[in-house]
């Protein structure tokens, strides 16, 4: 198959940047990034504490697998979730109350949760009213399955809608609420370099995700040189009370010598995501 275009009966789709490589090259890139991450625990140019952090985080990624070869970040990363009054998540701790944070492996997360950003990406997901499963989803905010190109979709998320027949964004006042929602996902490491998580911002918390994206960009390529705090805030409307995520800076930029660890973690996860996107586009 061409590395430039994916042809389906529905449409012609251009592969995204950095995914337009042969699958073999993406596989090799993934294997090399994994090897570089694993090797950090033995890199003598790094202080012992940082080598220990690298080893601990690598094991955290691999905590459910007996072999590093079986690591799959797309299914293995733990998410941080928020308790709403109606939350029925199977991993919610018994002692968790509305407004609390918990991990999808069942741990209660202390608030505020202090973290550093490794990288982030945007996705789209569409739910029809009353349905628990999405009717369409896009892992990159560009191509959705099964409805096709996001920028041509009648259900494009508010803020991304285009003037019909063009690629020109509609004026903000003409943007309408949609069943499809923007989601911002960030790969983060906690401030003690003990755990890796994904934090997803959507719906009423998308504003906090946009704030985090803007603040993190101020660090340039080294997003991890800034620390942030994740909190929740109680809100109310005609339907009752609910909670939203809030993000704020935790202090001045910090360079604590973890550049190699953070870059290796980012590179490994990005390589895994690129592999996943290539498979997604090829199977469309």
Give residue spans per PLM region:
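Exposed alpha-helical structural elements
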Residues: 56, 205-214, 257-263, 275
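Long, highly charged low-complexity segments enriched in Glu/Asp and Lys/Arg with interspersed Ser/Thr
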Residues: 124, 154, 237-284
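Extended serine/threonine-enriched, polar tracts that run as long, contiguous segments within proteins
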Residues: 177-252
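Generic surface-pattern signal
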Residues: 20, 39-42, 62, 66, ...
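OB-fold ssDNA-binding interfaces and closely related basic DNA-contact patches used
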Residues: 2-192, 237
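Intrinsically disordered, low-complexity N-terminal regions enriched in serine/proline/glycine
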Residues: 29, 118, 192, 196, ...
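Intrinsic-disorder-associated interaction segments
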Residues: 23-27, 43-46, 50, 201, ...
């Amino acid at each position: 198959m061409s590395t430039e275009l994916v042809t389906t009966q529905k449409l012609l789709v251009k592969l995204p940047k950095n995914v337009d490589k042969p699958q073999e090259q993406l596989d090799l890139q993934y294997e090399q990034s994994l090897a570089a991450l694993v090797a950090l625990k033995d890199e003598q140019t790094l202080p012992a504490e940082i080598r220990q952090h690298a080893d601990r985080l690598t094991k955290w990624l691999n905590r459910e697998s007996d072999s590093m070869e079986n690591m799959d970040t797309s299914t293995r990363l733990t998410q941080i979730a928020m308790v709403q009054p109606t939350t029925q998540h199977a991993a919610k701790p018994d002692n968790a109350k509305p407004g609390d944070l918990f991990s999808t492996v069942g741990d209660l997360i202390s608030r505020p949760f202090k973290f550093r950003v490794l990288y982030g990406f945007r996705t789209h997901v569409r739910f029809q009213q009353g349905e628990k499963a999405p009717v369409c989803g896009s892992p990159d905010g560009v191509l959705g399955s099964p409805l096709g190109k996001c920028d041509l979709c009648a259900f494009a998320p508010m803020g991304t809608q285009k003037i019909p027949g063009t690629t020109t964004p509609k004026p903000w006042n003409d943007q309408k609420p949609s069943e499809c929602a923007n989601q911002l996902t960030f790969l983060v490491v906690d401030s003690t370099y003990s755990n890796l998580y994904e934090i997803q911002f959507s719906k009423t918390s998308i504003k906090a995700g946009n704030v985090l994206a803007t603040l993190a960009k101020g660090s340039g390529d080294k997003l991890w040189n800034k620390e942030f705090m994740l909190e929740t805030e109680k809100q109310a409307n005609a339907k009752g009370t609910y909670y939203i995520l809030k993000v704020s800076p935790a202090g001045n930029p910090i360079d604590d010598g973890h550049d190699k660890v953070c870059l290796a973690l980012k590179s490994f996860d990005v390589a895994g995501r690129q592999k996943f996107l290539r498979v997604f586009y090829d199977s469309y």
